Amino acid sequence: MSNAPGTSKFQIDLRRHLRAQNICDNLVHLMCEIAEASKYVINAVRTGDLGVAGTSNLYGEEQLALDVLSDRIMRKRLIHSGVVCNIASEEMDEIYQCQASADGLYSVAYDPLDGSSLVDVNLAVGTIVSIYAGCDLLQPGRNQVAAMYILYGPRVSLVYTVGDGVHEFTMNNLMEFTLTRENVKMAPEGNIYAPGGLRNKYNAGDEKFIRHLEEKGCKLRYSGGFVPDINQVLMKGKGLFMYPALNGSPNGKLRVLFELNPMAFIIEHAGGAASNGSIPILDIVPESLDQRAPIYIGCREDVKTATSFVNGGKQEVKMAGSFVNG
């Protein structure tokens, strides 16, 4: 968006920027409510209980107290927004219906505190959000109307797309999100890689790909947190994150609905790509809340190379067209 005379980008707040995106008022309101909820989540991260909650989520994973509290914060804000019909969270066992009617409303899938196990060692974590029009959450990620993540690191940053560019905001000392970078774009290829999962459980194609990156002199940059690792690849504009199929875990670890779809939507709108090794992540039709998939996400050429190695050098892997012109 163009700055008004006498206005710097650091004075453009999230609501003002969203209103310039040619989206409806309800979506502006919803995304601002999520941003407001994140302020309470970061307070919980900084001061909250680091112990276990004594419960398990849908996937049988022991929930931390911060997981439960962060989910409660996000869910309450979404319910009271008045513009949400269905909610799905990584911390809930089933879809929560807020309103029966879908007219003008949205469904939201989110991971309230991705990487929560890293908090006790003071590493960066984040919130990931996917938004669809209407009540159906089990649809291809390409149908998202918006996706966003909030990174709780040395700075708190928010990145979003509504299908027209990717934009970064940073929380200032008044806890307001102001524009930092507009229309973030990725290079065709990079020299950073962030490989998740135990390497001794990689299949032959993935192992060959890692050796290829090492021989090229690429830099390994992996924190164990999905949000900070994706943010690094995106903001540097180069590189790739991968969490492949593993021996014993053929679908990898990350969830399509809560993690892969929103991040793939953001990365593609920045000119990158995201694939499960066969098709674009955004073309997967999820059949359940807990569906998982391998992922290769980042610069388009890096993803193309990765999928070629995974498929034994074959080049017929389907790649989505870039959302970014030029």
Swiss-Prot record:
Q: Which cofactor does it need?
A: Mg(2+)
State the free-text cofactor note. Answer: Binds 2 magnesium ions per subunit.
Record's catalysed reaction(s):
beta-D-fructose 1,6-bisphosphate + H2O = beta-D-fructose 6-phosphate + phosphate
Q: Provide the top EC class.
A: hydrolase
What is a GO molecular function of this protein?
A: magnesium ion binding
Matching SUPFAM superfamilies:
Carbohydrate phosphatase (SSF56655)
Write out the GO cellular component annotations.
Answer: cytosol
Keywords of this protein's UniProt record, alphabetized?
Carbohydrate metabolism, Cytoplasm, Hydrolase, Magnesium, Metal-binding
Where in the cell is the protein located? Cytoplasm
| Residues that, per the record, bind Mg(2+) 1 | 90, 111, 113
Its pathway is: Carbohydrate biosynthesis; gluconeogenesis
What EC number(s) does its UniProt record assign? Answer: 3.1.3.11
- UniProt-annotated binding residues for Mg(2+) 2: 111, 114, 259
| Highest taxon of the lineage | Bacteria
Record flagged with keyword Protease: no
For binding substrate, which residues are annotated in this chain's numbering? Answer: 114-117, 222, 253
Q: Tell me if Hydrolase is a UniProt keyword of this record.
A: yes
A single GO BP annotation from the record? fructose metabolic process
> Which family, according to the similarity comment?
Belongs to the FBPase class 1 family.
| Alphabetical list of PANTHER family matching this protein | FRUCTOSE-1,6-BISPHOSPHATASE-RELATED, SEDOHEPTULOSE-1,7-BISPHOSPHATASE, CHLOROPLASTIC
* Description of how the protein assembles with itself and partners: Homotetramer.
Protein name, per record: Fructose-1,6-bisphosphatase class 1
What is the species listed in this Swiss-Prot or TrEMBL entry?
A: Citrifermentans bemidjiense (strain ATCC BAA-1014 / DSM 16622 / JCM 12645 / Bem) (Geobacter bemidjiensis)
